[in-house]
């Protein structure tokens, strides 16, 4: 089954995606990351109000295969945390780009998005073409 990378999202090479809603960045992990991790058993996320910095770890995802850090694609303040995925981490795999989002961040520097990739560029990265 081919993995999907919706064209309206932005991507980073650490396998997070960004859905931009005005000055809010909705951040999650890509279908590629979900596929590589396998069964996700734990998600550690920051609390609302936490300041995160672009390029720095803001949490982790644990699967039966590995524990991977989550890296912030943008800087800002966490304004929402998806408690549903904290309570049921395996649900991320069902809809990584929809209900499986991780955090929402009010961006302090929207120019951070300049360093993100299109769906096409991200697909080329992960598919090695």
Curated annotation (Swiss-Prot):
The keyword Cell membrane does not apply. The keyword Metal-binding does not apply. One of its GO terms (biological process) is glycine decarboxylation via glycine cleavage system. Residues 24-106 form the Lipoyl-binding domain. It comes from the Bacteria. Disulfide bonds: none annotated. Gene3D superfamilies: 2.40.50.100. Coiled coil: none annotated. GO terms for cellular component: cytosol; glycine cleavage complex. Its cofactor is (R)-lipoate. The glycine cleavage system is composed of four proteins: P, T, L and H. Belongs to the GcvH family. The glycine cleavage system catalyzes the degradation of glycine. The H protein shuttles the methylamine group of glycine from the P protein to the T protein. This is Glycine cleavage system H protein. It comes from Synechococcus sp. (strain JA-3-3Ab).
């Amino acid at each position: 089954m081919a993995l999907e990378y919706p064209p309206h999202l932005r991507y980073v090479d650490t396998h997070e995606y960004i859905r931009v809603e005005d000055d809010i960045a909705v951040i999650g992990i890509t279908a590629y990351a979900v596929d590589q991790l396998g069964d996700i058993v734990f998600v550690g996320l920051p609390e609302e109000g936490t300041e995160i910095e672009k390029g720095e770890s803001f949490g982790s995802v644990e699967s039966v295969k590995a524990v991977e850090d989550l890296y912030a694609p943008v800087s800002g303040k966490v304004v929402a945390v998806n408690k549903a995925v904290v309570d049921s981490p395996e649900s991320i795999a069902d809809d990584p780009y929809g209900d499986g989002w991780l955090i929402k961040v009010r961006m302090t520097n929207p120019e951070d998005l300049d360093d993100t990739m299109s769906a096409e560029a991200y697909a080329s990265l992960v598919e090695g073409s």
